């Protein structure tokens, strides 16, 4: 049984405070987690004011994940997803070959959790093994790479993708460059945390060797359109470095201007959903609205924002809007607020959103958005005004695409994604 001390370190706390302990047992080929609150944390009004995970209640004793689950969402949110796990697996493969790790060594969920570099970990939860030493992981350097290293980082990510057998002589150097700044981040696509000249962290999302269109360029276009619509979206920039496709960089919204941490929870965690839950099993935007109604610090404002994002997603055919691609930020002492919008990408030939708009319909249909507007506390008059304004803005997508440097062929291929913006 691995004992992991869990600390809270969001911006309003004077110092990191221990929330409790995560017990990671091994069952066959996976970990089974149990969590218990620190008694002092339960008595601390700065820590016990809100639920961090629907599966973890504010009481003493060990608590367990939901049925058919092995981990809690709150900890999954600060663990690596497919890209980060790939980097860690590649490093272990090389360590075994070089005699630095015993043959047969396997990575468990707890290894992925503790293998994320503490400096770049998403959110404001931090971890210590056996409640000793530094917060983990603390290997592989301290500083995020500066923007000037983006070309080299992108080249390393492309080289890594082009070496599926992990045999290249330069592979360990590529991993050294990528694993600290990139192992903490979610999603399957290659990426890394980088720092601007003021030390602010950004996520650089690199082109993949498997791309057949400019994914980063189009994500930038959608980000610009969302900003012009008045949606809350993190600052983004796009530039070409080591390929003809754009690297899209977005400023991290889980850090303050002074480097403090903001606690982030995915919609998957806050709705008690699991990976893969989508419209086909009833996952809906109405569930996100319920989170804001029950736990929101500014529910009226955020419900309106959330409904507006539904309209926008329909207009740009952002059909990768699954539960991990929506999130909340902790507003200490008050509850939760909707995070900045992120991971919005147009899809040229799309059938429906990943989440239902009504209880049972996910169609790319503005009538569905109109139907549920009242649930999001948006009046019929306001709904029509928002839809009309958004259509006008999104209707300028080709102009933004040209300014971004996307070719006519790219524009022709992506045009179907924006067809609902035409009045």
Question: How should each PLM-predicted stretch be described?
Answer:
Residues 1-323, 327-423:
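Phosphate/dinucleotide-binding and metal-coordinating scaffold of catalytic cores
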């Amino acid at each position: 049984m691995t004992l992991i001390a869990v600390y809270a370190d969001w911006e309003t706390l004077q110092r990191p405070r221990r929330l409790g302990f995560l017990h990671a047992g091994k069952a066959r080929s996976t970990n089974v987690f149990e969590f218990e609150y620190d008694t002092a944390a339960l008595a601390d009004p700065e820590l016990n004011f809100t639920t961090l995970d629907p599966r973890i209640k504010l009481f003493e004793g060990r608590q367990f994940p939901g049925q058919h689950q092995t981990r809690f969402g709150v900890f999954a949110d600060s663990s690596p997803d497919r890209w980060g796990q790939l980097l860690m697996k590649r490093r272990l493969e090389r360590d075994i070959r070089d005699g630095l790790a015993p043959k047969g060594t396997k990575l468990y969920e707890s290894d992925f959790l503790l293998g994320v570099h503490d400096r770049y970990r998403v959110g404001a939860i931090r971890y210590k093994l056996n409640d000793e030493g530094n917060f983990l992981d603390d290997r592989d350097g301290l500083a995020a790479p500066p923007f000037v290293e983006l070309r080299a980082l992108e080249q390393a990510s492309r080289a890594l993708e082009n070496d599926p057998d992990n045999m290249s002589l330069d592979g360990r150097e590529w991993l050294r460059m990528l694993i600290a700044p990139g192992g903490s981040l979610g999603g399957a696509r290659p990426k890394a945390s980088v720092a601007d000249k003021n030390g602010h962290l950004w996520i650089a999302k690199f082109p993949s060797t498997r791309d057949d269109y400019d994914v980063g360029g189009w994500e930038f276009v959608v980000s610009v359109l969302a900003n012009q619509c008045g949606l809350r979206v993190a600052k983004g920039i796009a530039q070409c470095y080591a390929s003809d496709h754009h690297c899209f960089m977005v400023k991290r919204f889980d850090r303050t201007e002074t480097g403090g941490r903001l606690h982030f929870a995915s919609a998957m965690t806050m709705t008690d959903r699991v990976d893969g839950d989508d419209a086909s099993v009833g996952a809906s935007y109405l569930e996100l609205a319920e989170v804001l109604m029950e736990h929101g610090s500014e529910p009226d404002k955020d419900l309106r924002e959330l409904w507006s994002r539904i309209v926008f997603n329909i207009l740009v055919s952002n059909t990768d809007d699954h539960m991990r691609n929506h999130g909340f930020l902790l507003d200490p002492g008050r509850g939760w607020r909707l995070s900045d919008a992120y991971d919005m990408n147009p899809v040229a030939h799309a059938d429906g959103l990943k989440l239902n708009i009504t209880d049972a319909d996910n169609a790319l249909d503005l009538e569905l958005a109109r139907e549920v507007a009242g649930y999001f506390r948006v009046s019929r008059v306001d709904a029509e005004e928002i839809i009309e304004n958004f259509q006008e803005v999104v209707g300028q997508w080709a102009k933004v695409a040209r300014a971004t440097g996307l070719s006519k062929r790219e524009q022709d291929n992506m045009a179907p994604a924006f067809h609902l913006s035409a009045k």
